[in-house]
Amino acid sequence: GVPVEVLLLGDPARLRGAAKINWEILGRIGVTRRTIRGKSDWERWLRKKPRIRLVLDAILGTGLSGPVREPIRQVIGWLNRLPCEVVAMDLPSGLCADTGRPLGAAVRATRTVACAFPKAGFAGARRYTGRVVVADISFPRVLRP
């Protein structure tokens, strides 16, 4: 009974692979999808949402190899100012999984749902991860750290 919206930071026409398939599935099953291309889109969306209860951060993942660039850096700043719970999927966006240091900017989550196991850098990164919960995704035990 809770309304859900999925925000895409960028142009849906540029999506490829699983991201494109999942974006299309969301549309087919009736999930509200919004495209955020900049500050004006973000501010327009916020004005329409008087009470945001929860944000699920799944912007960037473990493949991030350099500093967070604009416009994602700006969006992370906006997320960090929202007065609601922020749950990061696997890793807060912008956080280095190995060191726990932000790569220019990082989401400050209240909770992180780590897939299979906590990342090596989580030990000193509670400011960004919040409470860490491990989700079993059937990762073979032999491959776990």
Residue ranges and their predicted role:
Residues G1-V55, L60, S65-E70, A120:
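A cross-family phosphate/adenosyl-ligand binding-site feature
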